[in-house]
């Protein structure tokens, strides 16, 4: 957006300088006439010798000429102020036209951004409704659609809004005894629940205002379901908690698309670049996001703020002003990105890992880079405070990299005094940064006692080193944590996204290598030249990092695909392809690319729109109804993590394990609970469950036999973890045949079996 304004300003100013030059030429003649007049009037020009006495006719002619000259001089002095006023008015008129053009450009950019934001919001709402028929589901069915950790997060939103007051609800989730019974935990600190707290406050405020004025907030009706399902009541409108909750999420992600447009427009220098970013996102929508299928996940709240943060960082890298506001905005967007999601710190670490080599070779001036590091440090500190001293923020690779970067910046001059070559100077700084970051990370983890917590970096390390144990297999056997599908690059190619980005990356890489080679050859820093393209180098490095992450963990495509869409906007950049646009019409090139993109892109959109379904899960509904009406409110349950989240959400019964698997203590509990799918003895498992105060165990027959891929059935995972019992029969099969004497079957349907722990 801002880039567009700058370019229009340049065009206007160049026109102004030309007209000003023309006015300058006309005005330049007037002092010459004036000077000539003054010379003649004062007798500055000498007559030939012997001609001092002139004839009367000559004197008269001289008088007439002198009178004419005096008249011209008088007119010049009289017209001078008017000419000045006229020139000033012309300049003012041009300035107004320039401001109007910039305002028009800004308004156009903002208008398009609002339009694409609304378009994306409608797209998300349509896909979500088509998939589940959410508007016609009962409250219980809507809660069941939030499976696994989604149900866990939504349960805290439900707790707050159903409490007598907002503050009481806040106190309840900060002193939660239901989730890891009998432990009392601060759920905000453990599960990053600021989104639920904020949305709950909005919901309570909205309902309070609507009730004050007596306005209806929802419409309810009875829905007749297929036999043997009974009739249920379904409500639609912002007064329904589930509708309000997902509505806020879709609005936020709709706004994200408007931000993508402005991001692409600013990076490429043209609004057409922003449109290419948006179209690429829509054409590759299934590869770019999953918010329409899984709204409550942490990434749905967090990722839009990463887009904002990267847009602000691009502005900082491109401009050379000392304005503090972009740096403050960078700090706040970092906080907004980190608070909702535990994996956000690792993504910010990849940013620092991309920025540091740019600083080393001279793409970023030290003072600017130092400010960026300080803002990141402040954002970590603020997040640590707001998350009630969550030590994960201080023991991450991100925090360690910030400290090492700060130390290297301070010691830079001392390293230079070693008198090494430029290349060795770079290698020393890079080696010190990597080694120092890794060592500092492990030291802080040990000191703060969080070395046993699983992070995204641990999963990536397990992938690279091919290390497996019970905990890593629980993660990596899930489809979203598998390697990238082989068909994904083909899908990128069909929409022309991959070829376009590869061409852009090659041009940036070629220019970067040429610049760095020249720096090494001349042994000087090309700060002015390199600073102009630092944002391009940064985006290229981030693209490489996101590509590596997406290949290792499929779920991280959510970072790669949108970033590729932003990079695709650079096909409109005259900075990169000005040589091409001077030979071929700019519009023809872009129109041709968009035409080819839209062939497969439109087919992808039609495939998404064709997904029509209606949610129902009768076995789980029967289970939840039985628990709600056939057990006491203090009965404690254990079982598969996804099912436990649903039990807590819909029945409010205590559970001992849940899907938020990063915490070391929780993983130890889950390991005990999942031992029913091992080859251990029934007595040993029963005794361990009693230590956790479990009253009922929910056994799922599918978990006894399901195998997502080789080595990923629960029995195979346990054989890796517990080889000493590999010869014993599976406990799950024993319990399905006859659970006595250590367990008693009290409920059973086609999927679930509830065992009372004796």
From Swiss-Prot:
This is Probable C-mannosyltransferase DPY19L2. Coiled coil: none annotated. One of its GO terms (molecular function) is mannosyltransferase activity. Residues 129-194, 318-343, 393-422, 510-533 are perinuclear space. It comes from the Eukaryota. Residues 1-58 are annotated as: Disordered. Probable C-mannosyltransferase that mediates C-mannosylation of tryptophan residues on target proteins. Its main location: nucleus. It comes from Homo sapiens. Keywords: Developmental protein, Differentiation, Disease variant, Glycosyltransferase, Membrane, Nucleus, Spermatogenesis, Transferase, Transmembrane, Transmembrane helix. Changing residue 480 to K: In SPGF9; uncertain significance. It is a multi-pass membrane protein.
């Amino acid at each position: 957006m801002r880039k567009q304004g700058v370019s229009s300003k340049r065009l206007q100013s160049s026109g102004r300088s030309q007209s000003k030059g023309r006015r300058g030429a006309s005005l330049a003649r007037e002092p010459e006439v004036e000077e000539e007049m003054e010379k003649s009037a004062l007798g500055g020009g000498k007559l030939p010798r012997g001609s001092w006495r002139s004839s009367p006719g000559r004197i008269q002619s001289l008088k007439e000429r002198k009178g004419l000259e005096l008249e011209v001089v008088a007119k010049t002095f009289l017209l001078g102020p008017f000419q000045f006023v006229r020139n000033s008015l012309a300049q003012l008129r041009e300035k107004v036209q320039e401001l109007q053009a910039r305002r028009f450009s800004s308004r156009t950019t903002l208008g398009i951004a609002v339009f694409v934001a609304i378009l994306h919001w409608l797209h998300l709402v349509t896909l979500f409704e088509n998939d589940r028929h959410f508007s016609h589901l009962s409250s219980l069915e809507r809660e069941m659609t939030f499976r696994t950790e989604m149900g866990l997060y939504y349960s805290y939103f439900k707790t707050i809004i159903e409490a007598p007051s907002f503050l009481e609800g806040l106190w309840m989730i900060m002193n939660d005894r239901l989730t890891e019974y009998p432990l009392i935990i601060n759920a905000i600190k453990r599960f990053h629940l600021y989104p639920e707290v904020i949305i709950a406050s909005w919901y309570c405020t909205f309902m309070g205002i609507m009730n004050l004025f007596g306005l209806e907030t929802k419409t309810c009706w009875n829905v007749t379901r297929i036999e043997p399902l009974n009739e249920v009541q379904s409500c639609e409108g912002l007064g329904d908690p589930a509708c309000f909750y997902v509505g806020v999420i879709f609005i936020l992600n709709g706004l994200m698309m408007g931000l993508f447009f402005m991001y692409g427009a600013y990076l490429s220098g043209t609004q057409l670049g922003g449109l290419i970013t948006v179209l690429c996102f829509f054409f590759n929508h299934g590869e770019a996001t999953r918010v329409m299928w899984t709204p409550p996940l942490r990434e749905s709240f967090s990722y839009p703020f990463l887009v904002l943060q990267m847009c602000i960082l691009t502005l900082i890298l491109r401009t050379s002003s000392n304005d503090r506001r972009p740096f403050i905005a960078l700090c706040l967007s970092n906080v907004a990105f980190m608070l909702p999601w535990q994996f956000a710190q690792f993504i910010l670490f990849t940013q620092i890992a991309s920025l540091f080599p740019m600083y080393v070779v001279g793409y970023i001036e030290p003072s600017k880079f130092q400010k960026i590091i300080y803002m990141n440090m402040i954002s970590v500190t603020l997040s640590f405070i707001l998350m009630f001293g969550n030590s994960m923020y201080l023991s991450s690779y991100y925090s360690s990299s910030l400290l090492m970067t700060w130390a290297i910046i301070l010691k830079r001059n001392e390293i230079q005094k070693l008198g090494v070559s430029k290349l060795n100077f770079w290698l020393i700084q890079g080696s010190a940064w990597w080694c120092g970051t890794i060592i500092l990370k492990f030291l802080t983890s040990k000191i703060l006692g969080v070395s046993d917590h699983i992070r995204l970096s641990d999963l990536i390390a397990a992938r690279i080193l091919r290390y497996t144990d019970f905990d890593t297999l629980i993660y990596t056997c899930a489809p979203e944590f598998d390697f990238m599908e082989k068909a994904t690059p083909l899908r990128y190619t069909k929409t022309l996204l991959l070829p376009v980005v590869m061409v852009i990356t090659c041009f940036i890489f070629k220019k970067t290598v040429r610049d760095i080679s020249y720096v090494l050859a001349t042994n000087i820093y090309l700060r002015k030249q390199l600073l102009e393209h630092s944002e391009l180098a940064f985006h290229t490095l981030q693209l490489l990092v996101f590509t590596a992450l997406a290949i290792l963990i499929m779920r991280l495509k959510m970072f790669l695909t949108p970033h590729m869409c932003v990079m695709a906007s650079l096909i409109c950049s005259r900075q990169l392809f000005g040589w091409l646009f001077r030979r071929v019409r700019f519009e023809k090139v872009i129109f041709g690319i968009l035409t080819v993109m839209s062939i497969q892109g439109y087919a992808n959109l039609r495939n998404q729109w064709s997904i029509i379904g209606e949610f129902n899960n009768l076995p789980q509904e029967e289970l939840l109804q039985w628990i709600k009406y056939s057990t006491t409110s203090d009965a404690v349950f254990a079982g598969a993590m996804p099912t436990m989240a649903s039990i807590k959400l819909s029945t409010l019964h205590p559970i001992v394990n849940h899907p938020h698997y990063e915490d070391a203590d929780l993983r130890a509990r889950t390991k005990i609970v999942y031992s029913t799918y091992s080859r251990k003895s029934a007595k040993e498992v029963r005794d361990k469950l009693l230590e956790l105060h479990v009253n009922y165990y929910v056994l799922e027959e599918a978990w006894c036999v399901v195998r997502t891929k080789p080595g990923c059935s629960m029995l195979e995972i346990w054989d890796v973890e517990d080889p000493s019992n590999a010869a014993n029969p599976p406990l799950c099969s024993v319990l399905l045949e006859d659970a006595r004497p250590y367990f008693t079957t009290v409920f059973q349907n086609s999927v679930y079996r509830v065992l009372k722990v004796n």
